[in-house]
Amino acid sequence: MNVKKIYMDADALLEGHFKLSSGNHSQFYLQSAKVLEDPKTAKLLADALALQIKESALEIDTVCAPALGGLIAGFALASALDVRSIFAERVDGVMNLRRGFEIKKGERVLMCEDIITTGGSAMEAAEVVKSLGGEIVGVAALANRGFCKRQNSDVTTKPNCKLPQDIPFFALDDFTFEMYAPEECPMCKSGSEAIKPGSRGN
């Protein structure tokens, strides 16, 4: 499956000057919402990701996604795995489980994002799940920005990856674009202003 082509065909691989949810700047941005607005494409990607997970024999009770970016990917993946789908959301800047969602003690939870950069949002949501007695058994995403090592990839883990190294990380492909701290960004130095296309207000 050519994930990059799917993103390009959906006009979801954007070029410009972007501020990512991690706070870093990049010349490229993956707008997964443009890919996932087509239910057939969402199902195609989720089915491929679910196949990887099933082949690993990982046992999962629930998929949990951090809102807003991971919502559709999480639901589509849960459907493909035939398990429960829940999401965590920010309230006053802090991740919470709301809307009647509950976690049973020992419940095996797979965290899901559309894109994993450092994995910070997924791990914030994972801490909520763990605080309620859930067990984080893995992480999944449609695409990996190349900071964390996924299953079946030769990309190595970078120091700023926030995903635990003792659980599997599944993704369909690696997108290893250059990223810069704001003070080191060459586009900022040339006078360009970064725009924020994602879903976190920072």
Swiss-Prot record:
- InterPro entries to which the protein is assigned, alphabetical: OPRT (IPR023031), Orotate_PRibTrfase_bac (IPR006273), PRibTrfase_dom (IPR000836), PRTase-like (IPR029057)
Which residues make up the binding site for 5-phospho-alpha-D-ribose 1-diphosphate? 113-121
Give the record's family classification.
Belongs to the purine/pyrimidine phosphoribosyltransferase family. PyrE subfamily.
Q: How does it assemble?
A: Homodimer.
The answer to keyword Oxidoreductase applying to this record is: no
Q: Give one GO term, molecular function aspect.
A: orotate phosphoribosyltransferase activity
State the pathway, as annotated in the record: Pyrimidine metabolism; UMP biosynthesis via de novo pathway; UMP from orotate: step 1/2
Required co-factor(s) are:
Mg(2+)
The protein's matches in PANTHER family, at most eight in alphabetical order, are given as: OROTATE PHOSPHORIBOSYLTRANSFERASE, URIDINE 5'-MONOPHOSPHATE SYNTHASE
Recall the taxonomic lineage recorded for the source organism: Bacteria, Pseudomonadati, Campylobacterota, Epsilonproteobacteria, Campylobacterales
Name of the protein in its database record: Orotate phosphoribosyltransferase
Q: What is its EC number?
A: 2.4.2.10
Source species, domain of life: Bacteria
SUPFAM superfamilies membership = PRTase-like
Protein species of origin: Sulfurimonas denitrificans (strain ATCC 33889 / DSM 1251)
Instruction: Extract the NCBIfam families matched here.
Output: pyrE_Therm
